[in-house]
Every structure is written in structure tokens, then in C-alpha cells.
Amino acid sequence: MTKKRHLFTSESVTEGHPDKICDQISDSILDAILSKDANARVACETTVTTGLVLVAGEITTSTYVDIPKIVRETIQGIGYTRAKYGFDAETCAVLTSIDEQSADIAMGVDQALEAREGQMTDAEIEAIGAGDQGLMFGFACNETQELMPLPISLAHKLARRLTEVRKDDTLSYLRPDGKTQVTVEYDENGKPVRVDTIVISTQHHPDVTWEEIDRDLKEHVIKAVVPAELMDGETKFFINPTGRFVIGGPQGDAGLTGRKIIVDTYGGYARHGGGAFSGKDATKVDRSAAYAARYVAKNIVAAGLAEKAEVQLAYAIGVAQPVSISVDTFGTGKVSEDVLVELVRNNFDLRPAGIIKMLDLRRPIYKQTAAYGHFGRTDVDLSWERTDKAAALKEQAGL
């Protein structure tokens, strides 16, 4: 039988990408507030352009944080430290425009919220409604050890490595902005078999040659990350394919919070409900329910109930219970999807306050998620990446 060729591509970006700068600023502000006021309501949006940062949104809190200071520290940590980059931590202007959360929204969410989740009764959890309507997806598959699709997993690792060799001066001519993209070939059974194409674009010092960049990235980035057995003589490499990438960061492109939602999740391999994560506290189901859906999907796959699983949750504003829960195993399930939905209902509390309690989401843990993906992370300890429900799911499924 002739082998059917099936390619799938995902991309990632470095922490110096303009949109990712914004995500990190928004989540740094969120973390700073949560560290002092765990019950704060935060929706923080950031935009950056040449020499300017604008922070806007709705924040309701009993504490004070120095937003311009947080902004500058975040930019400094990313590596925009020189004015000749067109954007730097010391000289950029920082404007803020912050309101309180709308009373109309708060009305549907606030009941019993002053109670700590750990001490809340079921009635109190039921009284806390979702902060908005919407649909959220979570996904897991057995392509990698972290139960993520291989293309996005490799793209994130390349982007992280690009930053590492810049910051440790292995390749001191690199600058903060950069993107990676990986195309993986799948066989007729849907299994990843090889890397077909790797694309890396990285900002750099004007005096370095393309030949140096091409050689160094293959040696210090690609070889360090991509397993040799996945590459062959047919694997294609496109390193800075325009030939030059000196002007970058916010000087090259304006950035906005929430513009890299596919990078943040599954690289396009699974569906997406459209809601962004960064800058939002856990009462926003855009964030917390997407984390919960990943937690559910990962435990289904870890339990061996399916090779891949996509979980959809949906909510109505002011209503605690999800209006729908669905599971799609793409024909790989060991039990029916109806059984899986029932297992999910019995083992996971998917009401907003239940999710916050289950995943302990009132902590200042979010900046670390704002670059290199929110899922499949092995470098940080994230509660939604645990597989502590897998054994119970397997037992209850009778496997």
C-alpha cells in the first residue's frame, strides 16, 4: 500500500516577541496583585509599540501595585535593555488606564466569593457563577511524554533554546525577538515519524552574517533540541529566510495581549474556543476552564482510556454549572464517549469555584505560563498538568 503523506505544522515565539511581551506584562501584573490579594478581580490588557507601553483593563482589588515598575522589570528580564533596540525598559513610556470591574459582571460572580475556596460549602461553590459565557477546549495525546502534540512541543523547545543561548551568551549576537515553526510528517496510522521542516527567524546584531547565524542555530539550537532520529537528509531548514532580521520587537511590530492563543495552547492541533489567557484571574473561565479541560483530557489519556482526547466545556455568565461537557477521542477511545462524559462529571468539579479549588488557581503562578506555552510544561509545576485522577478514571471505566 502506498504510504499517505500527512504533514502538520505548529509555531512558537520567544519571550521577546511583541505579543508575548504583552502577555508577560499582563501576567506579571496579575501575579503581583494575587500575591497580596488572592481574591482580586483582574482583566489586564497590554499593548506595546516603539518606545511605548499601554496597560488598560478592569482591576478590582484591595491592594496597590506599582504597575510602571512591574512593566519595566518585566521588559528588563526579557532583555530589552538598550535604546538602540527601539524599545528598552528604562526609556519606554508607560501609560496606564485602569477601571474597576463592571458591577453588572460582578453581580453574577460575587456571591460567597469572600469565602476561601478551601472552606466553601457545596452551596457556596454553586453560588459563584461563571464570569462570562464561552466555550473552552482541552486536549491531550500520547505523541510525547508530556501528552502534547509533537509539532508544538518541538516548536516551544526551539523557542526556549533560542532564548537560552541568547541569555547565556552562547550566541551573544542574538536579540530578544524570534519565532520557530516545526512541520512533522505523520504516517498512515497518524503517528509522527519524522520532522519535515524547521523554520527559525531570530532578531540579531547588524554585524553578524547570515552564514554565521545559519551554522550556529543548527549547531546550538536545533541539534540541542530535536532528536536526531526525527531528522534525515530530506529535512528542510529555513533559518532567517529573509536574510536579515535586525529591526524587531515592538519597533518592528506592535504587540497586544492575547494575540498568540494558538501558540499558548496546542499549535492548531486541537480546536480553540477563542478566549485568551494572560492578564485574567481565575474567575474568568476563558483561562480557568481551559486549564480544567486540559487537566481532564490529560488524565483521560494518562489513564489509557484514549490515545487522544479533546474536551469541550461551555458556560453561561452567572451560572455555575457548565452548560455542556463533551469528549471527542477521534476513534481512539477504549470506552464510549458517553461513558467518558459521565466519568468526567463524577470526578471533576467543573464549576468555576470548583475549578479554582481543584487546581489551586488563586496563587501568583501565571507569569511563568506567559511564554513557551501553558500546557505540556516540564520546567514548571502546574496543577493542571498533574495526572492524579488517571488511576480512578481507569478503575471506574473497568479497565
From Swiss-Prot:
Key words of the record: ATP-binding, Cytoplasm, Magnesium, Metal-binding, Nucleotide-binding, One-carbon metabolism, Potassium, Transferase
Residue sites binding Mg(2+) per the record: 19
Named in its record, the pathway it takes part in is: Amino-acid biosynthesis; S-adenosyl-L-methionine biosynthesis; S-adenosyl-L-methionine from L-methionine: step 1/1
Q: Report a single Gene Ontology molecular function.
A: magnesium ion binding
According to the record, the residues making up region (Flexible loop) are 101-111
Q: Note the Gene3D superfamilies from the entry.
A: 3.30.300.10
The record ties this protein, via PROSITE patterns, to: ADOMET_SYNTHASE_1 (PS00376), ADOMET_SYNTHASE_2 (PS00377)
Q: Name one Pfam family in it.
A: S-AdoMet_synt_C
Q: What class of enzyme is it?
A: transferase
Matching InterPro entries: ADOMET_SYNTHASE_CS, S-AdoMet_synt_C, S-AdoMet_synt_central, S-AdoMet_synt_N, S-AdoMet_synthetase, S-AdoMet_synthetase_sfam
Q: Coiled coil where?
A: none
Name the needed cofactors.
Mg(2+); K(+)
The residues that the entry says bind ATP are 17, 177-179, 244-245, 253, 259-260, 276, 280
Q: Where does K(+) bind?
A: 45
Name the domain of life this protein comes from.
Bacteria
The keyword DNA-binding belongs to this UniProt entry's keyword annotation: no
- Which reactions does this protein catalyse? L-methionine + ATP + H2O = S-adenosyl-L-methionine + phosphate + diphosphate
The record's GO CC annotations read: cytosol
Q: Which GO terms describe its biological process?
A: one-carbon metabolic process; S-adenosylmethionine biosynthetic process
Q: How is the cofactor bound?
A: Binds 2 divalent ions per subunit.
List the EC numbers from the record. Answer: 2.5.1.6
Function noted in UniProt: Catalyzes the formation of S-adenosylmethionine (AdoMet) from methionine and ATP. The overall synthetic reaction is composed of two sequential steps, AdoMet formation and the subsequent tripolyphosphate hydrolysis which occurs prior to release of AdoMet from the enzyme.
Q: Which family is annotated?
A: Belongs to the AdoMet synthase family.
NCBIfam families for this protein: metK (TIGR01034)
Q: How does it assemble?
A: Homotetramer; dimer of dimers.
Q: What is this protein called?
A: S-adenosylmethionine synthase
